[in-house]
């Protein structure tokens, strides 16, 4: 279904009895719209861990306004389907109040400059991130971590800084070759590196069960993205007691408002 011409390969609208779509929160995307409006299966099963959309659009109309089965994050943790986590909001003195606020979020180029260029104090912030990580992790030998960054420059800067301070790290971006991404994952799991810093990767579709430390190194206005990134560390793994989350909270723009009703609340 990644092909725009998939309907030409299977033109019969009733050909499929059962269609399963993962990450169904993407249903508003044009490619999904084409699929959903074209085929008429007897059963349509949509699955997502993040049904809430920041644009307010609901996925429920595809299912007659009803959710067949639902389990929320706290319930999944209580039932030991997911790993418990400890979440620390770490004070970040980086002043974001003067960064332009456009289209419901911070200007990413300005954020990138603040987080990766020395004239804006990027090295001081990276030093603070490393100090706080050292304060909260129990044993560096056991760390399997991901750091979510705002830009390619930011991811590289953080990886370089950690490496320069004896914390083996790598960074991955959309420019990274598939073979290198696979190798990075193997190195993280084996303990050869302690952190992988990423931008626009690992939000979904990646399963690294041993991840036990997550660093939120940028503001995230999207609840969906926040939960997806948090979810990278919630998989159960042998010997993993809990996930440690460090959220570096800067002096933010006062336009931020984290409110999002659940799909049931929207009914």
What are these model-predicted stretches?
Residues 29-82:
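Post-DEXD/H (motif II) to motif III coupling segment of the RecA-like Helicase ATP-binding lobe
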Residues 72-138:
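Conserved interdomain linker/interface between the two RecA-like ATPase lobes of SF2 helicase motors
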Residues 170, 176-198:
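Conserved helicase ATPase core of P-loop NTP-dependent helicases/translocases
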Residues 233-256:
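Conserved segment of the helicase C-terminal RecA-like domain
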Residues 258-265:
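Conserved small/polar residues in nucleotide/adenosyl-binding loops
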Residues 222-237:
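Conserved SF2 helicase motif VI
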Residues 1-15, 33:
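Conserved helix/coil segment N-terminal to the catalytic DExD/H
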Residues 206-219, 244-247:
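A short beta-strand element within the Helicase C-terminal
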């Amino acid at each position: 279904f990644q092909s725009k011409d998939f309907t030409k390969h299977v033109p019969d609208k009733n050909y499929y009895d059962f269609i399963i779509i993962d990450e169904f929160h993407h249903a508003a995307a044009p490619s999904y719209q084409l699929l959903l409006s074209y085929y008429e299966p007897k059963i349509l099963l949509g699955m997502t861990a993040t049904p809430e959309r920041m644009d307010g659009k609901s996925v429920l109309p595809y299912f007659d306004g009803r959710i067949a089965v639902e389990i929320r994050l706290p319930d999944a943790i209580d039932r030991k389907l997911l790993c418990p986590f400890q979440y620390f909001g770490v004070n970040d003195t980086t002043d974001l109040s003067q960064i332009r606020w456009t289209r419901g979020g911070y200007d990413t180029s300005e954020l990138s400059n603040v987080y990766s260029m020395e004239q804006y104090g990027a090295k001081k912030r990276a030093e603070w991130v490393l100090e706080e990580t050292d304060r909260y992790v129990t044993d560096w030998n056991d760390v399997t971590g991901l750091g979510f960054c705002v830009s390619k420059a930011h991811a590289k800067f953080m990886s370089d800084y950690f490496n320069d301070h004896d914390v083996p790290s790598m960074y991955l971006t959309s420019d990274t070759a598939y073979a290198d991404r696979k190798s990075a994952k193997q190195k993280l799991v084996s303990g050869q590196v302690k952190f992988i810093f990423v931008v626009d990767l690992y939000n979904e579709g990646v399963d690294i069960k041993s991840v036990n430390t997550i660093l939120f190194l940028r503001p995230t206005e999207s609840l969906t993205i926040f939960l997806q990134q948090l979810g990278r560390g919630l998989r159960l793994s042998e010997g993993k007691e809990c996930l440690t989350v460090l959220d570096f909270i800067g002096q933010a723009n006062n336009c931020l408002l984290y409110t999002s009703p659940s799909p049931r609340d929207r009914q």
